[in-house]
């Protein structure tokens, strides 16, 4: 339990429970993770569509390009910086940018892994579940390796 004075000139005591602080940080962390991942996926998609020429892994996922991966990295770094300034100043900017870069790389690895698993199972697309997004698995593939990262980062960052 943290205590102090909300307005030192009037000596109004306040109490802020650790549960409230923990809940706020958890909300900020989840928001950060989802905004960075969505920014990465969106940036990669639109940059790859507009500028994509060099295939990233043509045998696994022929639609993914190095240009798209670079666009995803730029978008994830931008979302990390915006998240830091908008609502998550508790996470230092260098840590936010480093975490976003790692999340982007893990997102691409998760995407390629999911594509390889689908190719191995001869299930090219599951778009009927979530039309317009390439299917449910295509929306969740970047979470494949980022979910454990979120867990361990939250576990060790605020120790």
Predicted regions and their residues:
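Interhelical loop and helix-boundary elements at the membrane-water interface
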Residues: 1-80, 85-146
């Amino acid at each position: 339990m943290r205590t102090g004075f909300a307005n030192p000139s009037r000596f109004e005591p306040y109490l802020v429970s650790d549960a409230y602080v923990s809940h706020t940080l958890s909300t900020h962390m989840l928001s950060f993770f989802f905004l960075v991942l969505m920014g990465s996926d969106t940036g990669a998609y639109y940059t790859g569509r507009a500028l994509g020429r060099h295939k990233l892994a043509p045998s696994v996922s022929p639609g993914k390009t190095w240009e798209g991966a670079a666009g995803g990295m730029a978008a994830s770094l931008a979302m990390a910086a915006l998240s830091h300034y908008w609502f998550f100043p508790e996470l230092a900017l260098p840590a936010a940018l480093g975490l976003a870069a790692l999340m982007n790389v893990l997102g691409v690895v998760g995407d390629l892994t999911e594509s390889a698993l689908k190719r191995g199972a001869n299930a090219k697309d599951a778009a009927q579940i979530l039309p317009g997004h390439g299917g449910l698995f295509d929306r969740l593939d970047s979470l494949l390796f980022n979910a454990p990262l979120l867990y361990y980062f939250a576990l060790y960052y605020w120790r």
